[in-house]
């Protein structure tokens, strides 16, 4: 299961644009934790934490335990608003997690045994359709990742949702089909270019001279 990462934050007493601007002037990023049928919790974050998570990637599916002086909250980072000119974080939205209340989250797919894949050894090309799968699951059972075994796949074979390992209690948001995760495509064959029509029709240099001499009477 995925692990919660702890981040420190400060409590904010009030909401509003003026208060948010004051928070930014103080060198902090205003944020809110909402959901789980509770009142929103107003907090302020160190901008370096937000920038670090943005650079790491995958922050929308990472699990956080937010610690403030008033307590702790488990949450997903759902949105980061950036300044239109500086690209510095201006506001962060977190979704509060509650045990027993399913959440929608994207889980990354790890592809295994690519080097020993039957199809890859024959020159096939791995075509990844989904690097991550959006699922619904309990916050306490969110998988860290799914695994796709490429070892037995030949050319034109594919991996579907039902082939993934580590899905556990996660349910995909796509429910109408056993959707494709990746496929081993045939190798690309580059055909030799045909000679241009004019070049094909042009006679050899020697033949052209012979024809010219033979034409004189």
From Swiss-Prot:
Stretches for region Disordered: 195-217
Keyword Oxidoreductase among record annotations: no
Signal peptide: none
Example of a GO cellular component annotation carried by this entry: cytosolic large ribosomal subunit
GO molecular function: 5S rRNA binding; structural constituent of ribosome
InterPro entries xrefs: Rbsml_bL25/Gln-tRNA_synth_N (IPR020056), Ribosomal_bL25/Gln-tRNA_synth (IPR011035), Ribosomal_bL25_b-dom (IPR020057), Ribosomal_bL25_C (IPR037121), Ribosomal_bL25_long (IPR001021), Ribosomal_L25_dom (IPR029751), Ribosomal_uL5_bac-type (IPR020930)
KW Ribonucleoprotein (keyword) present: yes
Biased composition (Low complexity): 195-211
CDD domains: Ribosomal_L25_TL5_CTC
One of the GO biological process terms: translation
Pfam families assigned to the protein according to its UniProt record, in alphabetical order: Ribosomal_L25p, Ribosomal_TL5_C
Swiss-Prot/TrEMBL keywords: Ribonucleoprotein, Ribosomal protein, RNA-binding, rRNA-binding
Coiled-coil residue windows: none
Subunit structure: Part of the 50S ribosomal subunit; part of the 5S rRNA/L5/L18/L25 subcomplex. Contacts the 5S rRNA. Binds to the 5S rRNA independently of L5 and L18.
Family: Belongs to the bacterial ribosomal protein bL25 family. CTC subfamily.
PANTHER family according to UniProt: RIBOSOMAL PROTEIN L25/GLN-TRNA SYNTHETASE, ANTI-CODON-BINDING DOMAIN-CONTAINING PROTEIN, RIBOSOMAL PROTEIN L25_GLN-TRNA SYNTHETASE, ANTI-CODON-BINDING DOMAIN-CONTAINING PROTEIN
Role, per record: This is one of the proteins that binds to the 5S RNA in the ribosome where it forms part of the central protuberance.
Name under which the protein is recorded: Large ribosomal subunit protein bL25
Gene: rplY
């Amino acid at each position: 299961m995925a692990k919660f990462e702890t981040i420190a934050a400060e409590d904010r007493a009030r909401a509003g644009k003026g208060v948010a601007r004051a928070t930014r002037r103080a060198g902090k990023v205003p944020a809110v934790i909402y959901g789980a049928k509770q009142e929103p919790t107003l907090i302020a974050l160190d901008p370096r934490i937000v920038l670090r998570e943005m650079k790491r990637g995958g922050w929308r599916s990472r699990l956080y335990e937010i610690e403030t002086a008033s307590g702790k909250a488990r949450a997903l980072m759902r949105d980061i608003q950036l300044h239109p000119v500086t690209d510095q974080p201006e506001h962060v939205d977190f979704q509060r997690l509650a045990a027993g209340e399913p959440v929608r989250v994207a889980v990354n797919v790890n592809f295994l045994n690519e080097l020993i894949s039957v199809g890859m050894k024959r020159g096939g090309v791995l075509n990844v359709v989904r690097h991550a799968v959006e699922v619904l699951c309990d916050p306490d059972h969110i998988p860290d990742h799914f695994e796709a075994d490429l070892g037995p796949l030949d050319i034109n074979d594919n991996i579907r949702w039902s082939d993934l390992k580590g899905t556990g209690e996660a349910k995909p948001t796509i429910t109408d089909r056993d959707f494709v995760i990746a496929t081993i495509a045939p190798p690309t064959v580059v055909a030799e270019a045909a000679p241009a029509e004019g070049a094909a029709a042009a006679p050899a240099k020697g033949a052209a001279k012979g024809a010219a001499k033979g034409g004189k009477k």
